[in-house]
UniProtKB/Swiss-Prot annotation:
GO terms for molecular function: prenyltransferase activity. The lineage of its organism: Eukaryota, Metazoa, Ecdysozoa, Arthropoda, Hexapoda. Residues 1-23 are annotated as: Disordered. It comes from Drosophila melanogaster (Fruit fly). This is UbiA prenyltransferase domain-containing protein 1 homolog. It is found in: Mitochondrion membrane. CDD domains: PT_UbiA_UBIAD1. It is a multi-pass membrane protein. Its EC number is 2.5.1.-. Prenyltransferase that mediates the formation of menaquinone-4 (MK-4), a vitamin K2 isoform, thereby acting as a mitochondrial electron carrier. Mediates the conversion of phylloquinone (PK) into MK-4, probably by cleaving the side chain of phylloquinone (PK) to release 2-methyl-1,4-naphthoquinone (menadione; K3) and then prenylating it with geranylgeranyl pyrophosphate (GGPP) to form MK-4. MK-4 acts as a membrane electron carrier downstream of a electron transport chain complex, improving mitochondrial oxygen consumption.
Length: 359
């Protein structure tokens, strides 16, 4: 039978899909449209050495991780920390459990990740995420639509599994926990799926409530088994700062969103008013901390150390050339700002009182 030969760039001879090395040993060449460049080199090395490469698996896991938008997770993690800290400082502190804390954090963050994935899917389906989109997961075909759907389903199932364990360990009534948890889960889906709150200018309201009062109340109740509505007052600084993340994102994407036919608060009020609103959301929490610091404890002045960074971010918001950096930088600020607030709540001799009734 006739054979075909081809001289490879390295000077080796290829016959019928086999490569002859300088030592005279023949190995199968890596072929296929997607096995090129570095991937082909890794695959060929694996065949020669007998050790399969793990780089492909690692890169896939990294891709899935990036699809979760980990930079945004401070919006759900910090309220959970705050609610847990308030539980530790409350009259029901003897109920505090580290196992409950970790399960609460896992449950809340997992649902947040699932909501991010759902957001990625529906933004792409509706033609909102295009070539200039910040989220490249589906735009650049990093993951397929089926993979994104599967990832979202797995995350929701994992969150529900965490909730079941939490319900077993928590002293709270099952119906109270379920009401808040499944309300939050539904909101994370309906933000872009189904009703699509994001697309009818209600996304800001959902985020303001969900990643503030609701998350703090859920974490507090999971630990203590009690409803304390004063915890919602403590959530106000975090809720405002978290809304600043979303508003900066929507302001940056306003032109693209308008072309896609959706309506956000940033589109309704325009660029100038959006800048004013962003500044209010960014700096109002610092005013609250200043008041708390003077009236209750100097510990509440601790988050003010992040104020210079807030001014830098606000300056970038006003510049079209640096506007694209603002959402992630605001999220980073939210994390450090929130952690310092939690530390203040843990260390302060006296906590603020909001005059609300406890149950």
């Amino acid at each position: 039978m006739a054979t075909s030969s081809q001289l490879l760039p390295n000077g080796n001879l290829s016959r019928n899909g086999k490569t002859k090395t300088e030592d005279g040993e023949e190995v199968e060449a890596v072929v296929g449209a997607r096995a090129a460049g570095a991937d082909a080199g890794v695959a060929l090395t694996g065949r020669l050495t007998g050790h399969p490469s793990t780089s492909g698996t690692f890169m896939k896991l990294k891709t899935y991780l990036l699809a979760l938008r980990p930079w945004s997770l401070s919006a759900s993690l910090v309220p959970t920390l705050l609610g847990s800290a308030l539980a530790y400082r409350s009259q029901w502190a003897e109920e505090f459990s580290l196992a409950t804390f970790f399960l609460t954090a896992f449950t809340v963050v997992t649902v947040h990740c699932a909501g991010n994935v759902v957001n990625t899917y529906f933004d792409f389906i509706k033609g909102i995420d295009k070539q200039k989109a910040d989220d490249r997961t589906l735009v650049d075909h990093i993951l397929t639509k089926d993979e994104v759907v599967s990832l979202g389903a797995i995350l929701y199932m994992a969150g529900c599994g965490g909730f079941v364990l939490l319900a077993v360990l928590s002293p709270a009534k099952m119906e109270h926990l379920a009401l808040i948890y499944f309300g939050g889960l539904s909101s994370s889906f309906l933000y872009t799926g189904g009703i699509g709150f994001k697309y009818i200018a209600l996304g800001d309201l959902v985020i303001l409530i969900l990643f503030g009062p609701i998350s703090v109340l859920f974490a507090f109740m999971s630990q203590t088994g009690h409803l304390d509505w004063t915890t919602m007052g403590y959530a106000i600084p975090l809720a405002l700062n978290t809304e600043a993340i979303l508003h900066s994102n929507n302001t940056r994407d306003a032109d693209n969103d308008r072309r896609a036919g959706i309506v956000t608060l940033a589109i309704l009020i325009g660029r100038t008013a959006s800048h004013v609103l962003y500044a209010m959301l960014l700096f109002a929490p610092y005013s609250l901390f200043f008041i708390f610091g003077l009236k209750y404890s100097l510990w509440f002045l601790l988050p003010l150390v992040t104020l210079p960074q807030a001014f830098q971010i606000e300056k970038r918001f006003r510049n079209e050339q640096t506007m694209h950096l603002v959402p992630r930088q605001t999220a980073k600020l939210n994390f450090f700002f929130g952690i310092l607030y939690v530390v203040a709540c843990c260390c302060a001799h006296q906590l603020p009182t909001f005059g609300l009734r406890r149950n």
